[in-house]
A protein has these predicted regions:
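Extracytoplasmic cysteine-anchoring/structural motifs
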Residues: 19-409
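Sec-dependent bacterial lipoprotein signal peptides
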Residues: 1-17
Length: 409
């Protein structure tokens, strides 16, 4: 592509601005395109799913799918870097030949974003990073939202500026400068998986009838990107958009259910944060385990909820059902409440190799939970009495670790 074409474009842009006299039109950064930007992206963890011999499920393929890519370019660096231009590409990890202005610049890449990038026109970087996604939009069909880190660079004039391999792009890209490698994208969600439920071997004769599994203290919004560097590139939101509610619940969201595990106010119930099966009966000899070819008994996408979170705002996985002891006593509506990845609850916590140590819910990780029932649970979902009734094992897994489930004999 000939760079002189972009010089002609700058004349057109300048003329359009000069001819406008509408004082209501917001002031835009008028830039002179005198270089191009081409970049390649990759989804963090996708390399494992493409490895030879790995059986990749349809679900895992969808988790890595890029439907849209938005490349946002800002002039300058820091919070006051001002919007320069953007490009949206569909169904591709490559975005070639974006007309840009040379000089100090900041780049942010968004995947599967629910926000029209035109909303960012005239905005500063700090303003753009305040935008949020909703957990309602995090579906496999539309694609999981992702973002790059905030990249500061210097774009060279009269040059094709490239992130990735120049040979990945069609056409002549000479002269060029490689500004960096392929840009990695990180999902905004974490995943909480219930892997198994069983009755303790010391609790012979007891039965638990599982009737519902739901999430609580889930943040319904996440920022679209972060300036923080990996592994602490948090996108946690601490407020909901105007008129919306930050804290979401699969069930029991009302304030009068509050206890030590739930101190939030004015929450909202969201159907997809609950799983209600036909009643499943669990005994010492009938363990509820993840089926072959499945990831979990029940699985939920959630947003980040970080280490400063008090006990009453930590993300929870709650099981509800009927407990029958070995004497036949029936106790309905019993709860087993698990504070996800909480080191202070006496759980067995296991972290995968090379995982940054953390004790909260962090994006792009899976939290795999196994529950052993020792006795009757609590009659309220958010009271800590449930801890004495169960043993919990939580495995923190990097997103790219694919578990190969064995056949259950």
């Amino acid at each position: 592509m000939k760079l002189r074409n972009y010089f002609l474009l700058s004349i057109v842009v300048g003329a359009a601005v000069a001819c406008s006299s509408n004082e209501d039109i917001p002031e835009e950064h008028v830039f002179t395109p005198n270089a191009t930007l081409s970049l390649a992206t990759g989804v963090y963890g996708d390399g494992r799913t493409k490895a030879v011999g790995i059986d990749v499920s349809e679900e895992e393929e969808k988790e890595n799918k890029i439907h849209t890519l938005d490349v946002l370019v800002f002039s300058g660096t820091g919070d006051d870097a001002v919007y320069q231009t953007q490009r949206r590409a569909n169904e591709t990890p490559l975005v070639p030949d974006i007309a840009v202005e040379a000089g100090s610049a900041t780049i942010v890449v968004l995947a599967n974003s629910s926000i029209d990038p035109k909303a960012f026109v005239t905005k500063k970087l700090s303003q753009v990073l305040e935008y949020t996604h909703s957990l309602k939009d995090e579906t496999l069909d539309r694609g999981l939202s992702m973002s790059s880190k905030v990249i500061e660079t210097n774009l060279t004039i009269d040059t094709h500026n490239i992130f990735g391999d120049a040979n990945s792009f069609v056409g002549n890209h000479s002269p060029n400068e490689i500004k960096g490698g392929k840009i990695e994208l990180y999902r905004h969600v974490a995943q909480v998986n219930l892997k198994s439920v069983k009755i303790s071997t010391t609790n012979t004769g007891a039965t638990f009838q599982l009737e519902e599994v739901f999430m609580a203290n889930v943040k319904g919004y996440s920022h679209i990107a972060s300036k923080k560097e990996y592994p602490n590139n948090w996108v946690e939101a601490n407020a909901a958009p105007s008129g919306e509610k930050l804290w979401w619940y699969g069930d029991y969201f009302e304030d009068d259910w509050n206890g030590e595990y739930k101190i939030t106010k004015d929450g909202v119930m969201i159907d997809f944060l609950a799983w209600t099966p036909e009643t499943i009966e669990i005994t010492k000899d009938a363990v509820l385990e993840t089926e072959n070819g499945k990831r979990a008994v029940a699985s939920f996408y959630v947003y980040e909820n970080l280490k400063e979170t008090p006990v009453g705002q930590r993300t929870l996985l709650v099981l509800k059902g009927t407990y029958i002891d070995n004497n036949g006593k029936v106790e309905k509506d019993r709860f087993y409440t698990i504070s996800v990845n909480d080191p202070n609850r006496g759980y067995t916590l296991t972290e995968g190799e090379d995982i940054p140590k953390h004790s909260f819910v962090k994006r792009n990780y899976r939290y795999n939970i196994s529950l052993t029932i020792n006795s009757s649970g609590s009659d309220r979902p958010y009271d800590p009495v449930t801890e004495a009734c169960m043993d919990v094992a939580v495995t923190v897994a990097d997103w790219d670790v694919i578990e190969q489930n064995e056949d259950l004999d």
